[in-house]
């Protein structure tokens, strides 16, 4: 049986709702939540199976999942979201908007 490489639309919707819920529970205000949603929509469309691929379909990076983290290996959306939030905290002082601004300028975060 072929391994799935994409989440369903329903799974993506559930992942997005879960991310918003986690961000809210962790004290991210509405603006910061919107920035995180914009960023992760751009990165993966909330697909927990997402990997960047070239035109032939081969992976072009080790980035994986909702937040497209380089060392992410968990297929669990909950863990991917929590790791993504932790990365925002470590790299951008907890500011999803700062991460989004960096992504706007550089094409990555």
PLM region descriptions:
Residues 10-109:
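Peptidoglycan cell-wall recognition and remodeling modules
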Residues 1-11:
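N-terminal secretory targeting signals
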């Amino acid at each position: 049986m072929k391994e799935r490489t994409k989440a369903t639309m329903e799974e993506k919707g559930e992942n997005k709702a879960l991310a918003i819920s986690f961000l809210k529970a962790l004290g991210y205000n509405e603006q910061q939540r919107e920035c995180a949603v914009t960023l992760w929509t751009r990165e993966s469309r909330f697909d927990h199976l997402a990997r960047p691929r070239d035109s032939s379909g081969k992976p072009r990076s080790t980035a994986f999942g909702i937040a497209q983290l380089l060392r992410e290996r968990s297929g669990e959306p909950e863990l991917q979201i929590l790791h993504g939030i932790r990365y925002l905290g470590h790299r951008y002082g907890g500011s999803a908007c700062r991460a989004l601004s960096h992504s706007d300028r550089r094409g990555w975060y």
